[in-house]
């Protein structure tokens, strides 16, 4: 490997060898693997993304499964190496898997796991946090105070945006987008406009019911509208949060032309995937529109930011921490481990990967199933009837 690596080993005489390319939060995931006869090896290589060659070295001559990260390039080379080592499964410790060549995994008969159903609320909470921080200019104000610049109250000091009664726009009303929308509607009495290829009836019913509640109590009811296009959301919303999947159709979804459609004092939040925004165009837009604000958790070419982004006062940037709550990260580690364990032991696939609470109950043994295998149909794997 390029740098010295320390390998932490649990249950060295275990029957099955499972490798984790990074230390993961909590210990439950380790205990679950060890209790089922696994030798667990954890790679400690801080502040470095493992290369393909590094991971091949970790896989070695015999490896039953690997738990990896979204930052790793899992393509044909790695799946070939894992297959030769007798491996049956790889799982991302992430809900996304755009770092994985699933077709290559299919070719070598390797199951690919992910961790949905555990990070919905925590990701939505960070999107809401970025929304508030941008609206009320919290980061700027914090720097102002720490710099010793505060000399007393002034009527124009860090004037920001009031969210109540404004319109929140959501692009991608899946689990996370809908959770975020509910937080902003119920928490701040914002009206909703959303765009999604599929109608979110459940979200619409929620906003309708909350609007009726407000009206019954003598307050202005909130409203909702399903937009016919993304451009409609961009033009009408005061605050816009992006929650699409990343594919060829959503790459640079927000570009120079679409940024120009937004209100001059709008707020844009992205906790989905970095490449859905043309980051270079965003930097120019921020420079040209000082009242426009953005909150970013993800970036086009992580871990780097486009030149100029770090210098803009109207941008809040955080290092891909949307899922970084203790319960969530430990849950993600557990699901990733159980994905690998399930395939190693020959268990079926859980029938609903979006309902994973039975795997996260620390007071009970998890079901004998892999929580979420994205290529289970392609591999012809059986589904649990539990």
Swiss-Prot record:
Keywords: Glycolate pathway, NAD, Oxidoreductase, Peroxisome, Photorespiration, Pyruvate. Slightly inhibited by oxalate. InterPro entries: D-isomer_2-hydroxyacid_DH (IPR050223), D-isomer_2_OHA_DH_cat_dom (IPR006139), D-isomer_DH_CS1 (IPR029752), D-isomer_DH_NAD-bd (IPR006140), NAD(P)-bd_dom_sf (IPR036291). SUPFAM superfamilies: Formate/glycerate dehydrogenase catalytic domain-like (SSF52283), NAD(P)-binding Rossmann-fold domains (SSF51735). Present in leaves (at protein level). Mostly expressed in photosynthetic tissues such as leaves, stems, flowers, buds, and, to a lower extent, in siliques and roots. A motif (Microbody targeting signal) lies at residues 384-386. Catalyzes the NADH-dependent reduction of hydroxypyruvate into glycerate in the photorespiratory core cycle. Mediates fatty acid beta-oxidation in germinating seeds when malate dehydrogenase is absent. PANTHER family: 2-HYDROXYACID DEHYDROGENASE-RELATED (PTHR10996), GLYOXYLATE REDUCTASE 1 (PTHR10996:SF257). This is Glycerate dehydrogenase HPR, peroxisomal.
């Amino acid at each position: 490997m390029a740098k010295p690596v320390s390998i932490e080993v649990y249950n060295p005489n275990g029957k099955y060898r499972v490798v984790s390319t990074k230390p993961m939060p909590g210990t439950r995931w380790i205990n679950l693997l060890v209790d089922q006869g696994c030798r667990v090896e954890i790679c400690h290589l801080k502040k470095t993304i493992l290369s393909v060659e590094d991971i091949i070295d970790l896989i070695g001559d015999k490896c039953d499964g690997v738990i990896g990260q979204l930052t790793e390039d899992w393509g044909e080379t790695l799946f070939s190496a894992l297959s030769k080592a007798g491996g049956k499964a790889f799982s991302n410790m992430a809900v996304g898997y755009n770092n994985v060549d699933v077709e290559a995994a299919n070719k070598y008969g390797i199951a690919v796991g992910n961790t949905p159903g555990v990070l919905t609320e925590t990701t939505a909470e960070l999107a809401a946090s970025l929304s508030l921080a941008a609206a009320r200019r919290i980061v700027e104000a914090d720097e102002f105070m720490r710099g010793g610049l505060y000399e007393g109250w002034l009527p124009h000091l860090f004037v920001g945006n009031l969210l109540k009664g404004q319109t929140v726009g959501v692009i991608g009303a899946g689990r996370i987008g809908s959770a975020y929308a509910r937080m902003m509607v119920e928490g701040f009495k914002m009206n909703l406009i959303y765009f999604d290829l599929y109608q979110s009836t459940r979200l619409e019913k929620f906003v309708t019911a909350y609007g009726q509640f407000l009206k019954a109590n003598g307050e202005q009811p909130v409203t909702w509208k399903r937009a016919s296009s993304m451009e409609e959301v961009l033009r009408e919303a005061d605050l816009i949060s992006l929650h699409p999947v990343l594919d060829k159709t959503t790459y640079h979804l927000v570009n120079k032309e679409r940024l120009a459609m937004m209100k001059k004092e709008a707020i844009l939040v992205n906790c989905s995937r970095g490449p859905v925004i043309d980051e270079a165009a965003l930097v120019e837009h921020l420079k040209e529109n000082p009242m426009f604000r953005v909150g970013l958790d993800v970036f086009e070419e992580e871990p780097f930011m486009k030149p100029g982004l770090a210098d803009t006062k109207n941008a809040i940037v955080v290092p891909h921490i949307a899922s970084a709550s203790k319960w969530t990260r430990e849950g993600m580690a557990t699901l990733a481990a159980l994905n690998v364990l399930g395939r190693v032991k020959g268990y079926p696939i859980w029938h609903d990967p979006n309902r994973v609470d039975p795997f996260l109950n620390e007071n009970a043994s998890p079901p004998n199933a892999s929580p979420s295998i994205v290529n289970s149909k392609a591999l012809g794997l059986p589904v649990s009837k539990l």
